[in-house]
Amino acid sequence: MEAQDAGLYYRGIDRIGWTDLVPRHELRKHGSSQDWSYMEGKSMDASVHYGSSKNEKFHGPHPHTLGQNRLLAALPEEVYERLAPDLEPVRLELGSVLHESGEHLRYIYFPVDSIVSLLCELDDGASGEIAVVGNEGLVGIALFMGGKSTLSRAVVQSAGFAFRIRADILVREFENGGALREVVLLYTQALITQTAQTAVCNRFHAVEQQLCRWLLMSLDRMPSNELTMTQELIANNLGVRREGVTEAAGKLQAAGLIHYCRGKIIVLDRPKLEQRACECYAVVEKEFYRLLSKRTLSTAR
């Protein structure tokens, strides 16, 4: 699949399943990715009992719904309703850590408009991103594979909201089989593909191509074309020197593809950004679509 073919699909969100990637020529039938008004997820009473100094418990009304996370949206109504009372909204701040490497996982997070990086760290302090999680997935996949912890570190790379649930509650639902197990296992396979492709990309492709891939994957998990991100954080995620990111971002800005200023990146020309990216972006997105499109979720409704 050619890199430019990644533009064939448009990402939106639908309450009933993973129907977010549709041919661009059908765009007018599905609304805009910037328009969230056609979603029908259920609002939650934002009362949270747990929190930390950086991931604060959130009190009062908020504009987010469970259906804005696509894994939750793919669940049948009875499962959705059963889990809803235990899903609590939390504000995830930029740079906050959801779990450290080897730490016992107490919660599972379903991002809504936040993005979380899964990082692998070396003894010398160097780190690299192995996967990125947004409103297409969840943080805490190791719990479903029988582990209580993972070697990766989960760090918020873009602030926003998520819904979280106690690990024991969701694992118990998973062990009962049915729709949740199907959705989680399909997502796990897609996440493995992303991790593998990221490793290949970081080994063989130029920094500019990696940056384009990373920006596109981040945008796909956001409701806007603007990212709040420092070049230092991007460099850490890609496992490259900051100077390399500065040079690559400068070329993209000079070409009119992005605008970067004071930690904010605005994508101005996504089609051209897709053309500059390597094939890794399209490979990962195609696999997510193949595994998690509405056609494959036979139990979703």
Tell me what each language-model feature is:
Residues 217-301:
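Phosphate-/nucleic-acid-contacting segments
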Residues 131-189, 193, 197:
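Cyclic-nucleotide recognition modules
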Residues 40-93, 138, 143-144:
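Cyclic nucleotide-binding regulatory module and flanking cytosolic helices
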Residues 96-158:
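Cyclic nucleotide-binding regulatory domains
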Residues 158-159, 174-241:
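Polybasic "coupling" helices that flank or enter modular domains
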